[in-house]
Amino acid sequence: PQPMKAQLDKTAHYYDLKTHPGQVVVLKMQVKNLTQTTKTVRMIPEPARTNPLGDVVYDRTVGQAINPRLGFEKLATGTQKMKLSAGQTRYLTVKVRLPKTMGNGVIAGGLHFQEVTAQRQRSQQQMLANRYAYVLGVVLHTGYVKKVAKVNLQARTMGHQIGIGINNKANQFVNQVKVTQTVKDARGHVVHQAAVQGKQLAPNVTAAMTLDQHTYQPGDYQVTTRFTSKTVHQTVTNNVKVK
């Protein structure tokens, strides 16, 4: 992506822009062919979605669209195709037209770049199956952008596993998320530790997840969960019973 003054997170490798209702957001990017042969590339705008774990994903077969009423694919320039000779760099412009009546909120999507091959041109099904070769994320904020300072956390049992329920009530993404859990038995001995990191939590989402596939014997456990991100740092301790 080309740098923009409206970029909120200067360290992000995707568009994270402050916008306003009615604005036409112009996204400029360069596409380079690093191979020694001519390539044809197709760009397709798609909405961002939330999977059952609360993660932001760009696969239209998974989960629910983020802000479906204002679908990113409806607002952005349609599919574009370009041919690049070996080593060639070309510039691509995508316009996103924000409704004047949209109010405050977040619109999220992805620009999907894929190589077009003769096989994909012959088979639409094959093209769809391989459409997510590379995704450039786009997050557009209108109104006051409030940093997420807290999420709701609650350890819970899922059969013979121990996981965590997460609720992000804010209309903002939570980036660079790391979740760790330390589980102690009734005698206070640490019986298991687990962690996941690199998650991006969607806005207005409630999700439940386990950090790994570890199973527990029936009994009482104390679970300490630590949730950290760019703006959130919190720890909660809960008692749970595995039956």
Question: What do the predicted segments below correspond to?
Answer:
Residues 62-102, 185-218:
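Intrinsically disordered, low-complexity Pro/Gly/Ser/Thr-rich segments with frequent PxxP/GP/PP motifs
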Residues 1-24, 156-158:
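N-terminal edge beta-strand
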Residues 92-143:
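C-terminal, structured domain-capping segment
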Residues 143-243:
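Membrane-proximal extracellular "stem/stalk" segments
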Residues 39, 107, 111, 219-226:
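A short tyrosine-centered beta-strand micro-motif
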Residues 39-52, 57-64, 114, 171-187:
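Short acidic, flexible loop segments centered on an aromatic residue
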Residues 31-37, 166-170:
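Asparagine-centered strand-capping/turn motif at beta-strand->loop junctions
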Residues 22-28, 90-92, 104-110, 160-161:
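Short, solvent-exposed loop/turn segments enriched in Ser/Thr/Gly
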